[in-house]
From Swiss-Prot:
This is Putative transposase InsO for insertion sequence element IS911A. PANTHER family: TRANSPOSASE INSF FOR INSERTION SEQUENCE IS3B-RELATED, TRANSPOSASE INSO FOR INSERTION SEQUENCE ELEMENT IS911B-RELATED. One of its GO terms (biological process) is transposition. Keywords: Transposable element, Transposition. The gene is insO1. It comes from the Bacteria. The lineage of its organism: Bacteria, Pseudomonadati, Pseudomonadota, Gammaproteobacteria, Enterobacterales. InterPro entries: Transposase_IS3/IS150/IS904.
Length: 141
């Protein structure tokens, strides 16, 4: 066998590995792969090997974090955490400037309501000029 491996340029260890491989695919591993893929999708890509192993075990599929990591690597899955939101939510009214309008923008006649629009936008992030799909208040004079 060593002569044939030498003639074909194959290492003996590679031949032995190929010869001892399982004949048919492992059904349990295929089920675990599908579970890993499903759980990764449910978490929106944020679950890592430990989280996936825990969730799979809770569902009744025995899996350790090492196996979960190997299956994630086979499937090309990577844990990616969603970034936190960059600005705080509104809702706190300024003490010195009360909100008389209370988002009632229905104007019946000109020069009745004056308001401004302060929008949080970062130029160059969304379309080059900030977020342009926000509602605007239009006044007629």
């Amino acid at each position: 066998m060593a002569t044939l491996c030498h003639v074909f340029g194959v290492h003996r260890s590679s031949y032995k590995y190929w010869k001892n491989r399982p004949e048919k695919p492992d059904g349990r591993r295929a089920v675990l792969r599908s579970q890993v893929l499903e759980l990764h999708g449910i978490s929106h890509g944020s679950a890592g090997a430990r989280s996936i192993a825990t969730m799979a075990t809770q569902r009744g599929y025995q899996m350790g974090r090492w196996l979960a990591g190997r299956l994630m690597k086979e499937l090309g899955l990577v844990s990616c955490q969603q970034p936190t939101h960059r600005y705080k939510r509104g809702g706190h009214e300024h003490v010195a400037i009360p909100n008389h309008l209370e988002r009632q923008f229905a104007v019946t006649e000109p020069n009745q309501v004056w308001c401004g629009d302060v929008t949080y936008s970062v130029p160059g992030v969304q379309g080059g000029h900030g977020c342009l799909n926000e509602p605007r208040v239009c006044l007629e004079y």
